């Protein structure tokens, strides 16, 4: 669940209203294109729920692969995980067919999360180790 929360949190930051804190570290050949992201409330608040709704288009079927997530608070690494996209932690079952995707998720932002600068990187690869998507994040909480 922690990995899923990190993935959706990073994905949420690709919304156009958050363009100052995220960058696409992928290439034009990436297989997943994000079409819309909505946060409610629009700014995460410690101790409150946040609902993230995200949609996008996957260009081709994915039968396996990995998600590498790294989240840091300052220079301290909080999350450094590499898991199968077909694992039980993933919200989709493999194979993942090409097409449109819409996911909604509500999570609580921990009230004891330290204030400060957080950075993150998510790289998703397919069964051939080809990049599906890559996002870098830089945010202050």
Curated annotation (Swiss-Prot):
Report the GO molecular function annotations: sterol binding
The residue range of the signal peptide is 1-19
Which controlled-vocabulary keywords does the entry list? Glycoprotein, Lipid transport, Signal, Transport
Provide the induction entry.
Down-regulated by phagocytic stimuli.
- Keyword Chloroplast in record: no
> In the UniProt record, which residues carry a glycan?
82, 104
Q: Does the keyword Ribosomal protein apply?
A: no
Which Pfam families does the UniProt entry name for this protein?
A: E1_DerP2_DerF2
What SUPFAM superfamilies does UniProt report for this protein, alphabetically? E set domains
Checking SMART domains in the record gives: ML
Q: Which GO terms describe its biological process?
A: sterol transport
Q: Which PANTHER family match?
A: COUNTIN-3-RELATED, NIEMANN PICK TYPE C2 PROTEIN NPC2-RELATED
> Function of this protein?
Catalyzes the intermembrane transfer of phosphatidylglycerol and phosphatidylinositol.
Q: What family is reported?
A: Belongs to the NPC2 family.
Which protein is depicted? Putative phosphatidylglycerol/phosphatidylinositol transfer protein DDB_G0278295
- Which organism's genome codes for this protein? Dictyostelium discoideum
